[in-house]
Amino acid sequence: MTEQTIAHKQKQLTKQVAAFAQPETKNSLIQLLNTFIPFFGLWFLAYLSLDVSYLLTLALTVIAAGFLTRIFIIFHDCCHQSFFKQKRYNHILGFLTGVLTLFPYLQWQHSHSIHHATSSNLDKRGTGDIWMLTVNEYKAASRRTKLAYRLYRNPFIMFILGPIYVFLITNRFNKKGARRKERVNTYLTNLAIVALAAACCLIFGWQSFLLVQGPIFLISGSIGVWLFYVQHTFEDSYFEADENWSYVQAAVEGSSFYKLPKLLQWLTGNIGYHHVHHLSPKVPNYKLEVAHEHHEPLKNVPTITLKTSLQSLAFRLWDEDNKQFVSFRAIKHIPVSLPPDSPEKQKLRKNA
């Protein structure tokens, strides 16, 4: 098959999937009802259960965390303007769900759009993605950079401490170069979060609020980071230098199909169909599965399950020569192939 034929087929696939990129107001409203009502109901039940048993409270917060994850998926769709047809409604709902999930709407919308435009591009890493080094970059790095990278990639730091740091601290500040509208949106989000937390503390008591909201926040945050991590970090993923990079290949080869049990698939808003989402970000979450089922090429993408996804914990570095993720242990037998004065090595020296 020639490169022109492959390019044509990729273009056709993108067009076909884009046909599903139409929000349906009825489905969106139903999703709001079957997400927000259970979430707030579970939150209140968890509060009431504090007088019975904290183990019962924790059990309820685990379920509530699943619904907060689903709320984040709605927020995510609003950022892509795919939840409602009208941009205004996406902005309003995006702001409100951003307050609940601790994300400033416009800031995350901007960084996430860059993630989509540069996903799997080795020359355009660094915005809206997880820090990833290649084997050659890691071997050429200073001891300090290696230590920082190993700490960053430690599961406890990435999935427990990481969400706390990102959601509570970095999300509260504007990025360098942010426009006025984005900066104001971040300030308003912060004010709304403080106001909501203060109101809950006054109504329920600060201790009760923390005992209920704390576990929900920690669990949903860990779930969110895990989903983002595992859907781009699997053994035979796709990463290329800019000159060889393809948007379609990055979507269907660099984004996994995370095949989850139906209940978990529902709670996570079908985000396991990540290859479909990256191919056409404007497809609403409730249409991702249908788009996947209607196109045979999408059924042949990298597929991972709950069990096999755990293998991703060992994948720390990208091996450019063998086109796959490897563990720290595996690189002992891989020679450095960076030229002495390569741009990558110079960049590493500068950043180290």
From Swiss-Prot:
Keywords, comma-separated and alphabetical: Cell membrane, Fatty acid biosynthesis, Fatty acid metabolism, Lipid biosynthesis, Lipid metabolism, Membrane, Oxidoreductase, Transmembrane, Transmembrane helix
Annotated compartments: Cell membrane
Annotated family: Belongs to the fatty acid desaturase type 1 family.
Presence of the UniProt keyword Hydrolase in the record: no
Motif Histidine box-2 mapped to chain: 112-116
Pathway: Lipid metabolism; fatty acid metabolism
Motif Histidine box-1, chain ranges: 76-80
SS bonds (residue pairs): none
A Pfam family it matches: FA_desaturase
Organism the protein comes from: Bacillus subtilis (strain 168)
Function statement: Catalyzes the introduction of a cis-double bond at the delta(5) position of existing saturated fatty acids attached to membrane phospholipids. It is not strictly specific for palmitic acid (C16) but can also accept C14 as well as C18 species to yield unsaturated fatty acids.
InterPro entries registered for this protein in UniProt: FA_desaturase_dom, Fatty_acid_desaturase
Induction or repression: Transcriptionally regulated by DesR/DesK in response to cold shock.
Motif Histidine box-3: chain residues: 274-278
Protein name: Fatty acid desaturase
Protein topology in the membrane: Multi-pass membrane protein
GO cellular component: plasma membrane
Gene Ontology molecular functions: oxidoreductase activity, acting on paired donors, with oxidation of a pair of donors resulting in the reduction of molecular oxygen to two molecules of water
Transmembrane intervals: 28-48, 55-75, 89-109, 151-171, 186-206, 209-229
Keyword Transferase: no
GO BP: fatty acid biosynthetic process; lipid metabolic process
